[in-house]
């Protein structure tokens, strides 16, 4: 994108004209800030790292959608921080691993828990980078994917039945409720119940953590909230 094109966009958004020379200076300063951000030292340990992506429009000759990968960390003391973001043509587990390996080179030493949307193969790639970290699949994405596979008239009931599972007060209760859910729907929606059985080892990791923070660690909503802004 040329400086003139950027200038036109800025004028449309903010109603103020900037010359191509001024835009050039601003973009150069911004590039320096971005490089500084992606080379900064990481000195803290993180209780939770959320990993997810969102597709945005990118112009490379022509305009197309690319996957903006985002890692957000919560420190042991509760501070929230965007650890890294990178643009890739498509979302891939390998991309997240590469981002984490870069953070490790810059000092990232310890992560207690990863929370992700459950992209196929991502758990294994995260374990390669941080073998001791726990892993949680995002319940919001689990429910969203399930509701795409069921009839409209069943969606409300299924949503309520799943809520009973992930909002249970203890892990054994959640596992019992999951078993009841699977038994209830296994004949009508076998693909749904089989998909839950395939990932059940990653559904209840949040019960290993204090009750006060469980609601914030069984989904990647924190990243989706950032993306809305």
Model regions and ranges:
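DNA-recognition alpha helix
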Residues: 2-15
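Short, solvent-exposed positions on alpha-helices
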Residues: 4, 21, 113, 141, ...
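Broad structural signal for hydrophobic residues in well-ordered alpha-helices, predominantly aliphatic
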Residues: 10, 126-127, 185
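RNase H-like nuclease fold core
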Residues: 16, 20, 25-115, 120, ...
